[in-house]
């Protein structure tokens, strides 16, 4: 045994899991599920009866919460599925940079400058037009599995 002390650099994040397990049979419509490593919102669930050999199966149809793609998965109802931790936070829009990044005001008064404008055309147009008109805009940012994206907009009146 050595008398040397070992110093370990802590990792940047707290090591919190991006997902948690939930039994497939308990996941409902409008819930969340991870399919093909993507966080999704469940739009349809159907369950098949137990066969001669095996389990009842759950058929999930879900929409990726960030890119809107439809994904499907079939899982035995007694098995666990990964469910993403999904958070939605509102920030006040301060500025839009020329390279497509937004500057947002957080609750504690600091700014968040690492988010790009959304890819959804109608939302993008609403944000740009509202900002150009000098309106006070609040954007909702959805975050899950290490990804973040602006998903909604609220107009709280003129500045």
UniProtKB/Swiss-Prot annotation:
GO molecular function, one term: translation elongation factor activity
Comp. bias intervals (Basic and acidic residues): 1-10
Hypusine found at: 52
UniProt function note: Translation factor that promotes translation elongation and termination, particularly upon ribosome stalling at specific amino acid sequence contexts. Binds between the exit (E) and peptidyl (P) site of the ribosome and promotes rescue of stalled ribosome: specifically required for efficient translation of polyproline-containing peptides as well as other motifs that stall the ribosome. Acts as a ribosome quality control (RQC) cofactor by joining the RQC complex to facilitate peptidyl transfer during CAT tailing step.
CDD domains in UniProt: S1_eIF5A
A Pfam family annotated for this UniProt entry: eIF-5a
Domain of life: Eukaryota
Region of interest: Disordered: 1-21
Family designation: Belongs to the eIF-5A family.
Protein keywords: Hypusine, Initiation factor, Protein biosynthesis
Protein name: Eukaryotic translation initiation factor 5A-2
GO biological process, one term: positive regulation of translational termination
Post-translational modification summary for this protein: Lys-52 undergoes hypusination, a unique post-translational modification that consists in the addition of a butylamino group from spermidine to lysine side chain, leading to the formation of the unusual amino acid hypusine. eIF-5As are the only known proteins to undergo this modification, which is essential for their function.
InterPro entries: IF5A-like, IF5A-like_N, NA-bd_OB-fold, Rib_uL2_dom2, Trans_elong_IF5A_hypusine_site, Transl_elong_IF5A_C, Translation_prot_SH3-like_sf
Disulphides: none
């Amino acid at each position: 045994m050595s008398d040397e002390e070992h110093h370990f650099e802590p990792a940047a994040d707290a090591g919190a899991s991006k997902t948690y397990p939930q039994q497939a049979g308990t996941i409902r419509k409008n819930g969340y599920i991870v399919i093909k490593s993507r966080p999704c919102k469940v739009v349809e669930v159907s369950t098949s009866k137990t066969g001669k050999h095996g389990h009842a199966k759950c058929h999930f149809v879900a929409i990726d919460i960030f890119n809107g793609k439809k994904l499907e998965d079939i899982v035995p109802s007694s098995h666990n599925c990964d469910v993403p931790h999904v958070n939605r936070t509102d920030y006040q829009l301060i500025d839009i940079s020329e390279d497509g990044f937004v500057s947002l005001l957080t609750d504690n008064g600091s700014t968040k400058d690492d988010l790009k404008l959304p890819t959804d055309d109608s939302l993008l147009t609403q944000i740009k037009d509202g900002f150009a008109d000098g309106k006070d805009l609040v954007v909702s940012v959805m975050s899950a599995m290490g990804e973040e994206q602006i998903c909604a907009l609220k107009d709280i009146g003129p500045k």
